[in-house]
Each structure stands twice: as structure tokens, then as C-alpha cells.
Amino acid sequence: LENRDDVDPERIGIIGLCMGGQQVWYAGALESRLKVCVIVCGTSTYEAMVLEMAPYHSHCLFTYVPGILRYGDTQDILALIAPKPLLIMNNYNDTWFPVSGYKKVCEELEAVYSAFGAPERFEHIIRDTVHDITPEFGGEARKWFEKWL
């Protein structure tokens, strides 16, 4: 991508929905060429996902990294993205990514971004909507990319 004539390698961002959002966790943390990250309906703590989601969506537990809770949880992975701009959006009724874990992740990331002196580079939005990149979420993502790229 960065070698294309129509791409500015200093202006590459990433967005992901659901499991694609989980891919943003790792890509954003590990790939320095990504300048901005957006996650849609793809964030909660592993703890909440395992305890609250498993009875409904046990087929999705393949996203769980065995043994990870001995070392940390979702917020610890996402903290590695800082201080890059990160926007996380979720919905209140998301059974795939429980709100209890989403709130914990966001609270901890607010502290991380503040410690970096960059609280404006982290934002989270939660709405009463569906598990999708809705027009509202898509518009918010577009504004975030335009602001930071």
C-alpha cells in the first residue's frame, strides 16, 4: 500500500468492525506505519467477553488468546497504540463485546492517553444502535481520519 503512487505513506489509517476491530488492536499496537486507528463494535475486555458472551457466541471464542489474562487484558494491548489517535465505537446492546468490558477498557485508555499528554488523541462513542458500521459510526470514523491524517 505504501508503495502506491496514490498513497501517502505518512497518512495510512486502519478501521475494523467486530473481529476486524480486534485485528486493529494488534495491527495498531505493532505496526508503526499505521498513523490512526478506528475500532467499531469490537472492543471489550477478554474477561467480559468470556464470562458474558460465551453462552451466546461460544463460536467466537477463537479470538481469545490462550493464557493472555495472566499478562493483561484488552486495555493493555490497546495501550500499546498510544499515543496514536484511537477512536473506539460500540453499541449498548452488543452481546459480542459487552458494555461492562468496553467501559473498563475506555476508562483505562483515558488514563493512558492522559499520561502521554495526548488525551485528545483518544475518543470513544457508545450508542443505542446495531453491531455494524452504521451511517453515524461511519461518519464519525471519517471525521476522525480527516482530523488526524
How should each PLM-predicted stretch be described?
Residues 1-18, 34:
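Gly/Ser-rich "nucleophile elbow"/oxyanion-hole loop immediately N-terminal to the catalytic nucleophile
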Residues 15, 40-41, 89, 127:
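Alpha/beta-hydrolase-fold catalytic nucleophile elbow
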Residues 29-35:
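Conserved hydrolase catalytic core segment
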Residues 61, 107-149:
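C-terminal catalytic histidine-bearing segment of alpha/beta-hydrolase fold enzymes
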